[in-house]
């Protein structure tokens, strides 16, 4: 299974691709897309859409795992993140790739075992799990963490699907 993890943001959008399953995951690619604040909003969104669509076409992931950010204290930040989130959803819909959202606590629990893990613990676990020596960007690290979280949740999703099919 190939999973694209997405840490949504307008100024910085993290993307990370992993392949494998919960027992053995392999790093394929990661990047942090950056848009300039001087760019007009349509140009920023277009750039993000084009790059996400390009990765979807090139790697053909089976799923996308995106951070579900429930609460933002600053309305303007929430609005901008929401626009980036929407652009990713559009690219996924156009490519026919299902999206799965995970909250920050789910990611922390999945990778570290506690919902109170800090950023350094997450980065350490991503690097250790994928055998990456250098990971310079927090947004890309978050994206890879989301992809790994999705892989970890796959056995539970499969069991739930089988149970639902038996009940029907």
From Swiss-Prot:
Any one GO CC term of the record: cytoplasm
UniProt family annotation: Belongs to the RuvC family.
Entry keyword DNA damage: yes
Gene (UniProt): ruvC
Reaction catalyzed: Endonucleolytic cleavage at a junction such as a reciprocal single-stranded crossover between two homologous DNA duplexes (Holliday junction)
Cellular compartments annotated: Cytoplasm
Protein name, as recorded: Crossover junction endodeoxyribonuclease RuvC
Record's keyword terms, sorted: Cytoplasm, DNA damage, DNA recombination, DNA repair, DNA-binding, Endonuclease, Hydrolase, Magnesium, Metal-binding, Nuclease
InterPro entries: RNaseH-like_sf (IPR012337), RNaseH_sf (IPR036397), X-over_junc_endoDNase_RuvC (IPR002176)
Purpose of the protein: The RuvA-RuvB-RuvC complex processes Holliday junction (HJ) DNA during genetic recombination and DNA repair. Endonuclease that resolves HJ intermediates. Cleaves cruciform DNA by making single-stranded nicks across the HJ at symmetrical positions within the homologous arms, yielding a 5'-phosphate and a 3'-hydroxyl group; requires a central core of homology in the junction. The consensus cleavage sequence is 5'-(A/T)TT(C/G)-3'. Cleavage occurs on the 3'-side of the TT dinucleotide at the point of strand exchange.
GO MF terms, alphabetically ordered: crossover junction DNA endonuclease activity; DNA binding; magnesium ion binding
């Amino acid at each position: 299974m190939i999973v694209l993890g997405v840490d949504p943001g307008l100024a910085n959008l993290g993307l990370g691709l992993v392949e494998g399953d919960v027992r053995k995951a392999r790093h394929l690619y990661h990047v942090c897309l950056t848009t300039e604040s001087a760019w007009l909003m349509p140009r920023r969104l277009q750039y993000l859409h084009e790059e996400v669509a390009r990765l979807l076409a090139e790697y053909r992931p089976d799923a996308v795992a995106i951070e579900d950010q429930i609460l933002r204290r600053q309305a303007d930040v929430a609005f901008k993140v929401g626009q980036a989130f929407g652009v990713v959803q559009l690219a996924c819909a156009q490519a026919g790739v299902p999206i799965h959202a995970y909250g920050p606590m789910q990611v922390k629990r999945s990778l570290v075992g506690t919902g109170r893990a800090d950023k350094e613990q997450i980065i350490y676990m991503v690097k250790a799990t994928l055998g990456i020596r250098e990971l310079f960007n927090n947004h890309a690290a978050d994206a890879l963490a989301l992809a790994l979280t999705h892989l970890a949740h796959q056995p539970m999703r499969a069991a739930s699907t089988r149970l639902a099919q038996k009940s029907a």
